[in-house]
Amino acid sequence: MRRAVIIPARLGSTRLKEKPLKNLLGKPLIRWVVEGLVKTGERVILATDSERVKEVVEDLCEVFLTPSDLPSGSDRVLYVVRDLDVDLIINYQGDEPFVYEEDIKLIFRELEKGERVVTLARKDKEAYERPEDVKVVLDREGYALYFSRSPIPYFRKNDTFYPLKHVGIYGFRKETLMEFGAMPPSKLEQIEGLEQLRLLENGIKIKVLITENYYHGVDTEEDLKIVEEKLKNL
């Protein structure tokens, strides 16, 4: 099956100015992301609204210029996918410099087996109370029951259950991604500010794979410092 990893990257980030171009150990953040994904051997496409961002990575991967007024990263991916000859897509966040080939391959493998949507989560106690970290709870077969910024599940008794932090990397079958794009925003999606709830509210299952790999997206200057320290030790 034909497949591609698409990275949405908007220059005008609201929380961190010109985030894709932020210097990270001598390289722009977006170049870290693209270089890591290119090493997986997959087809890599950057979807950006900026010529400046394009220039940083066009020697590494395909680049599609998209309108600047698209409301979200998902819309940017959809803009590219509509006319793309692919069957399976991974939407990889442009602010996530940690890339693990085994996780990319695993997501594609699940899609090839017939899953419609696949994502990742990892055990993380520290994320439990932080609203900026999205938590997920699963059913017995590894499908998402719910995603929330609130601490879920609630621990009525002190036990050894570890909360799962959602890693915002998504694999889609193309037809499911197009279906998602045609759906209006859902009630729970608007309440939590989480697009993936639109899928659950419309009865589309999301397979969640548990990874032990470290991920840390960059949204603030503090995140940038944390990521720099981690990358130094790789």
Curated annotation (Swiss-Prot):
Reactions this protein catalyses: 3-deoxy-alpha-D-manno-oct-2-ulosonate + CTP = CMP-3-deoxy-beta-D-manno-octulosonate + diphosphate
EC class (word): transferase
Gene Ontology terms for molecular function: 3-deoxy-manno-octulosonate cytidylyltransferase activity
Pfam families for the chain: CTP_transf_3
Swiss-Prot/TrEMBL keywords: Cytoplasm, Lipopolysaccharide biosynthesis, Nucleotidyltransferase, Transferase
Stored InterPro entries: Cytidylyl_trans (IPR003329), KdsB (IPR004528), Nucleotide-diphossugar_trans (IPR029044)
An individual GO BP term: CMP-keto-3-deoxy-D-manno-octulosonic acid biosynthetic process
UniProt GO cellular component terms: cytosol
Predominant cellular place of this UniProt entry's protein: cytoplasm
Subcellular locations according to the entry: Cytoplasm
EC number in record: 2.7.7.38
CDD domains linked to this entry: CMP-KDO-Synthetase
Source species, domain of life: Bacteria
SUPFAM superfamilies: Nucleotide-diphospho-sugar transferases
Pathway annotation from the record: Nucleotide-sugar biosynthesis; CMP-3-deoxy-D-manno-octulosonate biosynthesis; CMP-3-deoxy-D-manno-octulosonate from 3-deoxy-D-manno-octulosonate and CTP: step 1/1; Bacterial outer membrane biogenesis; lipopolysaccharide biosynthesis
Family per similarity comment: Belongs to the KdsB family.
Function: Activates KDO (a required 8-carbon sugar) for incorporation into bacterial lipopolysaccharide in Gram-negative bacteria.
Name the record gives this protein: 3-deoxy-manno-octulosonate cytidylyltransferase
